[in-house]
Design a protein with these regions (language model features):
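Small-residue-rich alpha-helical segments with characteristic i,i+4
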Residues: 106-177, 181
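Symmetry-related core transmembrane helices of the 12-TM Major Facilitator Superfamily/SLC fold
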Residues: 181-198
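Juxtamembrane/transmembrane-helix interface segments of polytopic membrane transporters
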Residues: 34, 90-97, 152, 156-169, ...
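Transmembrane core module of solute transporters
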Residues: 1-139, 218-219
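Intrinsic disorder in cytosolic terminal tails and internal cytosolic loops
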Residues: 200-221
Length: 221
């Protein structure tokens, strides 16, 4: 069972709020962009995936650096910066994507989005784990992973609904209009995640073990 007292810790709660909002905007937008490349610009599914690689591959190179920086700089600043870059990139994509937009105009915002995503991943995991006792890290990690997945699920559902309401598949222009509006909504949601990240307390110390809640493994022994 997930101890509800975890959520009395502002660091844990705000880190998970930021995770929820980040995955909401990111996955909802990637879902629509993959369709944009196929439906509007005529690429195959494989070709669409290749074109999103500047975004999705960046964490492979940047995340280790972000993790190291989080040991020297306040993690909330790195997480907040990552979410800010992600929000800016989504807004950029939402403003320039037309049926005839050259792919070259999307590379820069994709790279910015990838850097933002990379700056977010490792530090937020460290923050979540540092907010609980060592023996409870598994529960905290599981909670964060579940919240991320829920963010992605709701992001795809809500942004797809925005897309359908504003645009649709009637024409290439209708698809672009719907997608751009949905991606801009995603950018706004991720910006709220940045606010949550910057609002996190700066202390990364683990909470003291509470006498009222003894270690269950110690009790069993």
């Amino acid at each position: 069972m997930l101890p509800m007292r975890f959520f009395r810790n502002r660091v844990f709660t705000l880190a998970n709020v930021a995770s929820l909002l980040m995955f909401f905007g990111m996955f909802g937008s990637i879902f629509l962009l993959a369709q944009f490349f196929q439906t509007v610009q005529g690429y195959s599914p494989f070709g669409a995936g290749l074109r999103i690689l500047p975004w999705t591959l960046a964490p492979m190179f940047i995340a280790p650096v972000a993790g190291a920086l989080s040991d020297r700089i306040s993690p909330r600043l790195i997480i907040g910066l990552g979410l800010t870059l992600q929000s800016v990139a989504l807004a950029w994509i939402g403003l320039v994507s037309t049926p005839t937009v050259p792919y070259s105009q999307l590379i820069a915002p994709f790279i910015v989005a990838g850097v933002g995503m990379a700056l977010f991943f490792a530090p937020v995991a460290n923050v979540v784990l540092s907010a609980v006792r060592p023996i409870e890290e598994g529960k905290a990690s599981g909670a964060n992973n579940t919240i991320r997945e829920l963010g992605g699920v709701f992001g795809v559902a809500v942004l797809a609904a925005v897309f359908s309401h504003v645009g649709g598949y009637q024409s290439l222009e209708a698809f672009s209009d719907g997608m751009n509006t949905a991606v801009l909504v995603g950018a706004a949601v991720v910006a709220l995640g940045a606010v949550a990240a910057f609002a996190m307390p700066g202390s990364g110390r683990r909470p003291e073990i509470e006498a009222a809640e003894p270690d269950p493994l110690a009790q069993a022994a």
